[in-house]
């Protein structure tokens, strides 16, 4: 039985035995192959290790690819900065050609070097870099430093010209070029209508920065300057909105036809994008102004708040497909008025110069990249398209200028003359904006992109080099109306006063104009906005606040430049220094030291401290504040003493004589008693002079007054004639110490008119009293009294 079973299942057993043998042989082959592969790899690694040199710590290594982009960009900016320095060292060169010409030439030089060495330039310009990093600083600088008053006075004409002018130029150039493209002989049949309209929108973006520099030097009238400035400020935003809308239409046309509904939706979007961007900017401007209200203890971050909120308004608007350019412009205009009131003077200086620096760097990079792009093989030259583009730019610019200003002149009090319109037409210079938009055209939608870029470069070179250089001689040839000289503080105050007066007259007459609108906005601003957004309580009167701003500005200029300003409240220019200088005797030096000790401002002892988040005030800022405080105190005392007539008595015009000191109040005994007991005890310094005020009879105290007015300078002027203190005491008292001019530091008495009839006829009512200033001097006052009493013409009747 067992044998039978073995015989029966023997074939299967044999098959199983064969399979087992095959598996064992296969596994042995795999093991051998794996071992051979591992042995081969090991041998190869050892061979490679033996062939390579041994690595160690190298003293010098070169990895240029790692730093190529920032390194070359830094060199570009440094080269342009050095070129600017050399450009402005020769004072005649800026008057002959604009600065943008220099930057383009530097870029062309760099491009020639790159092209000659067959080196690939770094990707400085693409869509994200331009719109997110290069464009915002340029727009922010233009909006922040915009002169708000003349801009809003001409806001109607500026909007009329900037918006409609950009639309007319874009549509006119695009339609005209589309007609040229229909001519088969020119070989432009593949350029459709949308592509021509898009090119017309980007080529109509003007950049009259060079023209504005020429206008500033030529001092053209204010309204002409503001029209060009307003066009430069708003034209970029309008052009970019139109550019993006036509890009969307081009993408849509690639897959489907454009209908009338799409065109109407695009027009509505144009309005929504512009107004939405402006509203976003206003909101962010108010927020930034409100936050700077609480930064008095951490002033180091004040510039950061200004820049971050401005940039955030741009990014937030772009996130919602609104106009970021108009948003950052509105934010800058809104925040400037309130931020300057809250931040410190050091922070304001930082904001001003850092903003200028960022704008200059961005424009430099764009112009240099324009010059780099000029030299190369990425151009398509079509004579017909380029020449007609240049011609249509000039033709449609002229049509839009003369047509729009003919209409606007019908509603203006001061219309633009034909000469002004010619200058506006000639100032249509294309620049960085047009080139950037042309360079960023998507190649998938524009197969003839190289031709568009070439035509844009030709238009830019023509307008910058030809029109930018010749606009100065044209202004002088046409004899365009010039602006007046720089207004003084007195003129500024009277202009503000006349604004209030005109607003009141318009309110009475029922007339409505920008004076009344501005006056209502100021009331709303003082009632609500300033209380919320500004930290300090400034004077309620706008005239007083304007005076304070102008005084602070003038004081800072006096400190920084060292030159006394020529405005209405400036100190008169001093006499020239005497050439011969004598050596002073020890007695003279001691007398000078005594006088200076009793008259000069004492240095206040302060405990020095350090705060990481606050900037140390500059010396010029302290000096400016000290000058402002002294000047305000002087003016306050002058206004207080300026009531020279007896109380309650009308002014007379006869028998006027002049005294050295003004009258007080003769009818108030209590006021005289308080004045007699008043003394300056606020000064904690022991060397400061004590000042007392006393009321006494004008006639009885005349000799004492004369004795106290004379400074004992005769002992310091041995061999000289006694010095007479006449009319000079009203401005600045000068003594010559051994041939050296010195200004006496003592209170400045003012001369006031007194009615002599009131003196002679009012003996029974009480004599006029004189508030005199008694200064305690260390030297003897007796020298020169008789001479002064006998020769002073101010104490005699006229």
From Swiss-Prot:
Q: Which InterPro entries match?
A: Cation/H_exchanger_CPA1 (IPR018422), Cation/H_exchanger_TM (IPR006153), NaH_exchanger (IPR004709), NHE-2/4 (IPR001953), NHE_CaM-bd (IPR032103)
**A single cellular component GO annotation:** zymogen granule membrane
One molecular function GO term is: sodium:proton antiporter activity
Transmembrane stretches, start-end: 95-115, 128-148, 155-175, 197-217, 227-247, 271-291, 305-325, 357-373, 385-405, 451-471
Q: How does it sit in the membrane?
A: Multi-pass membrane protein
The places in or outside the cell where this protein is found are: Basolateral cell membrane; Apical cell membrane; Zymogen granule membrane
Output the PTM entry: May be phosphorylated.
Q: Which UniProt keywords apply?
A: Antiport, Cell membrane, Cytoplasmic vesicle, Glycoprotein, Ion transport, Membrane, Phosphoprotein, Sodium, Sodium transport, Transmembrane, Transmembrane helix, Transport
Catalytic activity reads: Na(+)(in) + H(+)(out) = Na(+)(out) + H(+)(in); Na(+)(out) + NH4(+)(in) = Na(+)(in) + NH4(+)(out)
Could you tell me the superkingdom of the organism this chain comes from? Eukaryota
List residues in the membrane that do not cross it. Answer: 14-28, 70-90, 421-441
Residues on the Extracellular side? 116-127, 176-196, 248-270, 326-356, 406-420, 442-450
- Those parts of the protein on the Cytoplasmic side are 1-13, 29-69, 91-94, 149-154, 218-226, 292-304, 374-384, 472-798
Q: Which residues form a coiled coil?
A: none
The record's subunit annotation is: Homodimer; each protomer has one site for sodium and one site for proton binding. Interacts with CHP1 and CHP2.
Q: What does this protein do?
A: Electroneutral antiporter that exchanges sodium for protons or ammonium ions at the basolateral membrane of epithelia to regulate cell volume and intracellular pH upon hypertonic conditions. As part of transcellular ammonia transport in renal tubules, mediates basolateral ammonium extrusion in the medullary thick ascending limb, regulating the corticopapillary ammonium gradient and overall renal acid excretion. Mediates sodium:proton exchange in gastric parietal cells secondary to cAMP-dependent acid secretion and hyperosmolarity.
Return the similarity comment.
Belongs to the monovalent cation:proton antiporter 1 (CPA1) transporter (TC 2.A.36) family.
Q: What name does this protein carry? A: Sodium/hydrogen exchanger 4
Task: Supply the source organism for this entry.
Answer: Homo sapiens (Human)
């Amino acid at each position: 039985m067992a044998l039978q079973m073995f015989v029966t299942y023997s074939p299967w057993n044999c098959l199983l035995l064969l399979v087992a043998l095959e598996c064992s042989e296969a596994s042995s082959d795999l093991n051998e192959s794996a071992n051979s592969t591992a042995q081969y790899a090991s041998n190869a690694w050892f061979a490679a290790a033996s062939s390579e040199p041994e690595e160690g710590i190298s003293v010098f290594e070169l990895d240029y690819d790692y730093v190529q982009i920032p390194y070359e960009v830094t060199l570009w900016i440094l080269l342009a900065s050095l070129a600017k320095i050399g450009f402005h060292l020769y004072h005649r060169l800026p008057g002959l050609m604009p600065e943008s010409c220099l930057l383009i030439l530097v870029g062309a030089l760099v491009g020639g070097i790159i092209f000659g060495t067959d080196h690939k330039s770094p990707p400085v310009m693409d869509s994200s870099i331009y719109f997110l990093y290069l464009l915002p600083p340029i727009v922010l600088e233009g909006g922040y430093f915009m002169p708000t008053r003349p801009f809003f006075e001409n806001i109607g004409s500026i909007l009329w010209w900037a918006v409609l002018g950009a639309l007319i130029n874009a549509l006119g150039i695009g339609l005209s070029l589309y007609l040229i493209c229909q001519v088969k002989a020119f070989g432009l049949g593949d350029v459709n209508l949308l592509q021509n309209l898009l090119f017309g929108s980007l080529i109509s973006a003007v950049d009259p920065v060079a023209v504005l520099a020429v206008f500033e030097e030529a001092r053209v009238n204010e309204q002409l300057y503001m029209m060009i400035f307003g066009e430069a400020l708003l034209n970029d935003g309008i052009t970019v909105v139109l550019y993006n809308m036509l890009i969307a239409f081009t993408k849509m046309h690639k897959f489907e036809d454009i209908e009338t509904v799409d065109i109407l939706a695009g027009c509505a979007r144009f309005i929504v994008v512009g107004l939405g961007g402006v509203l976003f900017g206003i909101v962010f401007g108010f927020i930034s102004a409100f936050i700077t209200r609480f930064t008095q203890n951490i002033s180091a971050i004040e510039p950061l708040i200004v820049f971050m909120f401005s940039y955030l308004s741009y990014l937030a608007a772009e996130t919602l497909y609104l106009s970021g350019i108009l948003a950052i412009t509105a934010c800058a205009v809104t925040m400037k008025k309130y931020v300057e009131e809250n931040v410190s003077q050091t922070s304001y200086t930082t904001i001003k110069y850092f903003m200028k620096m960022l704008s200059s760097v961005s424009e430099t990079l764009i112009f240099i990249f324009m010059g780099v792009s000029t030299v190369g093989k990425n151009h398509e030259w079509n004579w017909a398209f380029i020449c007609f583009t240049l011609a249509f730019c000039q033709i449609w610019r002229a049509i839009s200028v003369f047509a729009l200003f003919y209409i606007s002149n019908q509603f203006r009090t001061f219309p633009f003359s034909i000469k002004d319109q010619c200058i506006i037409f000639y100032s249509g210079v294309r620049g960085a904006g047009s080139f950037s938009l042309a360079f960023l055209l998507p190649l998938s939608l524009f197969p003839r992109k190289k031709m568009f870029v070439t035509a844009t470069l030709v238009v830019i070179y023509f307008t910058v080099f030809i029109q930018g250089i010749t606009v100065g001689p044209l202004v002088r040839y046409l004899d365009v109306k010039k602006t007046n000289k720089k207004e003084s503080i007195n003129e500024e105050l009277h202009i503000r006063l006349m604004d209030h007066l005109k607003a009141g007259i318009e309110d009475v007459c029922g007339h409505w104009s920008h004076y009344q609108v501005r006056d209502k906005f100021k009331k709303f601003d003082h009632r609500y906005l300033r209380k919320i957004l500004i930290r300090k309580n400034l004077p309620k009167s706008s005239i007083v606040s304007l005076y304070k701003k102008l005084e602070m500005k003038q004081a800072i200029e006096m400190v920084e430049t060292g030159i006394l300003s020529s405005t209405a409240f400036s100190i008169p220019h001093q006499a020239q220094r005497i050439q011969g200088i004598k050596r002073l005797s020890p007695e003279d030096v001691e007398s000078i030291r005594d006088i200076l000790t009793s008259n000069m401002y004492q240095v206040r002892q302060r405990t020095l401290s350090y705060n990481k988040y606050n900037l140390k005030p500059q010396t010029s800022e302290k000096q400016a504040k000290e000058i402002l405080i002294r000047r305000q105190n002087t003016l306050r005392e002058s206004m207080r003493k300026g009531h020279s007539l007896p109380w309650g008595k009308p002014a007379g015009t006869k028998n006027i004589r002049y005294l050295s000191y003004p009258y007080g109040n003769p009818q108030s005994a209590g006021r005289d008693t308080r004045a007699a007991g008043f003394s300056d005890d606020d000064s904690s310094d022991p060397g400061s002079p004590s000042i007392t005020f006393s009321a006494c009879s004008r006639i009885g105290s005349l000799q004492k007054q004369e004795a106290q007015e004379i400074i004992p300078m005769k002992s310091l002027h041995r061999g000289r004639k006694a010095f007479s203190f006449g009319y000079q005491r009203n401005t600045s008292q000068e003594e010559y110490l051994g041939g050296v001019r010195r200004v006496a530091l003592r209170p400045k008495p003012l001369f006031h008119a007194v009615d002599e009839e009131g003196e002679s006829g009012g003996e029974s009512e009480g004599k006029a009293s004189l508030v005199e200033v008694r200064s305690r001097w260390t030297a003897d006052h007796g020298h020169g009294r008789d001479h002064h009493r006998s020769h002073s013409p101010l104490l005699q009747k006229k």
